[in-house]
């Protein structure tokens, strides 16, 4: 009978995954700080990324060093934002957001991933029209009743409130511009989201199965594992990929 991975092997895998997450967040901090300054109180984009870093258990020292490097107080690599679009097998639309210090390397890695899995890269705007950019705040029913969260969200300027009874979850939808304000106003009422992000949501999902689902899942996994890739969005139905 075969033996499973050792405790040390599992720990190493966990540390490696954590390291990749930290690397990506540090790049995001740098870009946000360079674009809007190193003061999170006057830079909503930086504030969002810092919240994400703290939620991932990144230390304040690491966050502060990343900000200082970005604004020139410490030496560091400069990254730029790049977005690629394309199609996975089955006509699944994919958006890939990257932070890179070498565009040629990044586009080569992303193109190789698409080709390897039977997809293809497209021109700018080829799939983005199928998505909307939204702020999403996720709350558990346990922290407050549906009516209270809904009323607070509307008063704070949210666009919509979605209730998922089966998942015991309430989603508050905002515009990207109103995201930080809505989050902070609801937090002032004691309503803290367990997850908050600005993301792309597809207008409609595509269902895939069989070998197509396997290839789509493989492509998304490869893209997400690339060091330069920050976020991957698609319009594939996640249930068909076994990701819900």
UniProtKB/Swiss-Prot annotation:
GO molecular function terms listed in the Swiss-Prot or TrEMBL record: DNA binding
SUPFAM superfamilies: YebC-like (SSF75625)
Chief localization: cytoplasm
Key words of the record: Cytoplasm, DNA-binding, Transcription, Transcription regulation
Annotated signal sequence range: none
Pfam family, any one: TACO1_YebC_N
GO CC annotation, single: cytosol
Gene3D superfamilies tied to this protein: 1.10.10.200, 3.30.70.980
GO biological process, one term: regulation of DNA-templated transcription
UniProt record similarity statement: Belongs to the TACO1 family.
NCBIfam families named in the record: PRK00110.1, PRK12378.1, YebC/PmpR family DNA-binding transcriptional regulator
Protein known as: Probable transcriptional regulatory protein Xfasm12_1059
């Amino acid at each position: 009978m075969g033996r499973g991975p050792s405790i040390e092997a599992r720990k190493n895998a966990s540390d490696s995954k954590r390291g990749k997450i930290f690397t990506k967040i540090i790049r995001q901090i740098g870009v946000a700080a360079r674009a809007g300054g190193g003061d999170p109180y006057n830079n909503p984009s930086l504030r969002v990324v810092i919240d994400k870093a703290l939620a991932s258990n990144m230390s304040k020292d690491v966050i502060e060093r990343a900000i200082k490097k970005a604004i020139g107080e410490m030496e560091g690599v400069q990254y730029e934002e790049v977005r690629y679009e394309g199609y996975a097998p089955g006509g699944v639309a994919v958006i890939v957001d990257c932070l890179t210090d070498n565009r040629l390397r990044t586009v080569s890695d992303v193109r190789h991933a698409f080709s390897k899995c039977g997809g293809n890269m497209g021109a700018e705007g080829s799939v983005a029209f199928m998505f909307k950019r939204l702020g999403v705040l996720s709350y558990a029913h346990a922290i407050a009743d549906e009516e209270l969260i809904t009323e607070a969200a509307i008063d704070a300027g949210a666009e919509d409130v979605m209730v998922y009874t089966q998942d015991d979850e309430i989603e508050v939808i905002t515009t990207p511009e109103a995201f930080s304000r809505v989050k902070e106003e609801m937090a002032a009422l004691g309503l803290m989201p367990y997850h908050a992000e600005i993301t792309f949501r597809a207008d409609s999902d595509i269902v895939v199965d069989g070998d197509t689902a396997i290839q789509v899942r493989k492509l998304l996994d490869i893209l997400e594992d690339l060091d330069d890739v920050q976020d991957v969005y698609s319009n594939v139905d996640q249930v068909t990929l076994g990701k819900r």
